[in-house]
Each structure stands twice: as C-alpha cells, then as structure tokens.
Amino acid sequence: MTEKHLLKDMTWVEFRERLAENPVILLPFGSQEEQGPMAPMGDWMLTEAIADRIAREAGAIAAPTMPFGYADYFRPIPGGIAFRPDTFRRVLEDICENFLNHGLDHLVVFNGHSGNFPLVDQTIRKIKEERGVLIPCLNVWRLMTAKEWEAFHPQGMKAFGHGGDPLTSVYLHLFPELMRMDLAEPSPEPGTLLDLPTAGLNAVKFQGVDINLAVDVTDRAANGVAGGDPTQSAAEIGEKMTNFIVEFTVDFIRHFKTVETRTHKK
C-alpha cells in the first residue's frame, strides 16, 4: 500500500508508526481573503494543493491547512475571515506544541499568506527560546527570485502584486473552473491617504520614501487588485511557478531532514 502523506488521511496507529523516523511535518497556512474580482477568496486552497504534492514527493507529512490568517487590511471587503494577531500566534504555537510534545522536531511552516509572516516569526522565536527547537518558515509566494520571474512571466517582477501574480496564474493552473477571468481588470492607479499615494498595503510615498501607515486594500485599490495585471496571467505561467515552488521546497525538506533542529532541551 502506498504510504500516506496527509495527516488527515492517516489513522493514529499509522502516524505512530512514523514517529520513529521523525518525519518532516509540513504546516501549511493560508488565508480567506479577497484576491481581486476574478479569483476565489480561499487562497489557502493553493497552499493546500501545493503542500500535498510536496509532502508526497519529499516523503514528508502535511498537516491540515490552516485556512485563516492575519489580514486586517482586507476587512473592508466582505467574505474574508481573519484572526486577531494574538489568536494567530496562539494557534500556530498550539499546533507546533502538539507535534513537539511527541518528540517531532522537524517542523516547517509553509506560509501562503505574506501578512502572516511577522506573527510566524514572533512565534517561532518564542518556541526557539522556550523549547530549544528551530522551526523554519517558507513564504510560498516569496520563494521565486527575480531570476525565476523573468524566466516564467513576460512582465517579470512587474507582474507581482496582490490580485495579480503569482496567485492568479497559479489559480488558473490548479483551479481554472473557479476563476472568473471575465471580471479581471488591472490594478488601478494608487489611491491616496494624507494626500499622498499609497504604496502597497502598509505605506504611502513621500518624496520617493515609504512612510508606514495603516493602509486598507480599498485605500489602495477599490477593485482589490493592489498590484500587477491579472489580465496577463495564464495557466502556463502558473504551472511553471508551481513546479518551481514544489521543486525548491522538496530540495529544502531533503536538506532539513539531515540537520539537527534542537539548540537545547527543556
């Protein structure tokens, strides 16, 4: 029988049998948030699908995907579900503790929502201090460098942005039946706050310098497309991006299996 690689599919006896090998446990996190007018709000589905493939190819075990994250700047648009910062930190810590308490110390956070990362960083630092275990975090959509963007997308890094790529192209590759490309439209000119143009979702520009500010997505773009141009997205681009993310993460997991993660024991 083929070895199972998804924790949700395993019996507890099957999982217990894997404990001796101290497998790498992939912890996928995503978000329930708007992704422009043409894409489903459940972007955690992308993280889940990619994590499934990675775990299968790397001999790892993928935990169930956490579909909610920290996404305060998307609250003005209905349909999103976001944790408070403290809730997110507690959820991640509790998930990690459940594995650490059984001696599993090769955990990898597979983060499919960039807004989660500051809270992930705070939590894995706390675990390092209190449990003496190093837990890496791979930010899914930041794994591609400018080199990959130039190779995969005719617009290069200019295509990157919330509501643009990589998510739109990856959606077209993995879930084309859910897409409404008839509603796709480019990112509009940045909105303004304090009579200054918004720059992303956490700043405005003043004399070419980013000034941090509490920017909501609707301050930046009424249509929810805060960067890039989803009309230029394509399933073929998404396939290349997905393959790269899988191959990179599988390579990392194979390395991670071979190293010690404990800095001390408490």
Please give the residue ranges for each predicted region.
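Extended, histidine- and acidic-residue-enriched regions that form the cofactor-binding/catalytic faces
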Residues: 1-106, 114-266
